[in-house]
Structures are given as structure tokens and as C-alpha cells.
Amino acid sequence: ALPEDSTFPLLVPRGFADRMAKGDPHDPLLRQVWPERSESVMQADELSDPVGDLSARKAPGLLQKYHGRALVVATGACAVHCRYCFRRHYPYADDTAAAAGWRGAVELIRADHSIHEVILSGGDPLSLADHKLAELTDALSDIPHVRRLRIHSRLPIVLPERVDAGLLAWLRGLPWPVALVVHAN
């Protein structure tokens, strides 16, 4: 049975679930998404923000941990709740670039000439519609010191149909070298 008090409930696309071995509680695909009761108990050595995102926040939806690059939390939406997600406690409702209309994040990137690489992350940025992705990257394309784009996504693995003609056309039309970092197990 699923834990009743899960703040990070089971969420998995049907196509990904269809690839799981039915009746096998040890199936590796199932283990990636199945909530365990122990997850709701914070251990003494655990952190709710294990990668320091909140201390790296520069504006709503903009994180900067390293010189030369900035991470845009493009959305809090994701097609799957992976049990190992290090942003499960991230305050997406209050702190995404989309919630702020991109403007603040884009303007801070524009003002910081040391930023040459922008990372789109989230949630999962490919959860956004193509026109929303284009809206964000169009705003970023006006910044001459941005020279590279990275997109971090799990959707090509759990929802491969998201990689469609529209998404590929958007990717081909981007003015920078693009690295699509696919989160796979």
C-alpha cells in the first residue's frame, strides 16, 4: 500500500508504467517511482535541500552556484516523481521563473556578463509547451554573453513521445550550442 501521508506522491506516465514487470516489487523501473513509508521520516543526517538550491537563489526561479552559469527553474511540473529527486522539497509554488513571468531571471542574467551558460531545469523544463520554451529562450537569445544552453530533462526516458517534431524544431532553431542532459538510470 502507498504511504498515506506522502508529500511526494506516486506520479508516473502510463507508458513508463507499462514497461514495468507486472507483479515484481523489485522491478528497477518500479523502484524508481514507488513511494516508501520511510521517505516521510527525515533522518538526522538528511537535509531538505541537499544540493543547496535555496542558498543559491538569486531571484525567483534563478539559481547560481557556479561562476559563469545560471540555472533557471523553468517550471515545477514534472511527468514523474522519482524517489531520488533532490528537489522534492523545493518551493515550486513560490519560486519558479514561470511564476515570475521569466522577467526577473532574464534581467539578472542580462546584468551579469560573467554568465555564459544557462541551464533550464525544474521540475522538468520539457513539461512546458513548446511555445513556453520558445518564449523563455527568445528572451535569453537577446543576451549576447549567453553562449550555451543546457536543458536537464527526464522526459525523453519516461515520456519519449514528448520528443516530437515541434520540440525538435524548437531545438534546431536555438541560436546556441545546446546540450540536452537526459536524466536516465
Per-segment meaning from a language model:
Residues 183-185:
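Catalytic beta/alpha-barrel core
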Residues 77-81:
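Short pre-active-site segment immediately N-terminal to redox-active cysteine/selenocysteine motifs
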Residues 34, 42-46, 50-73, 83-177:
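Conserved Radical SAM active-site core
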Residues 179-181:
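Long hydrophobic alpha-helical segments typical of transmembrane helices together
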Residues 1-65:
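Flexible, acidic/Gly-rich N-terminal and inter-domain linker regions that tether
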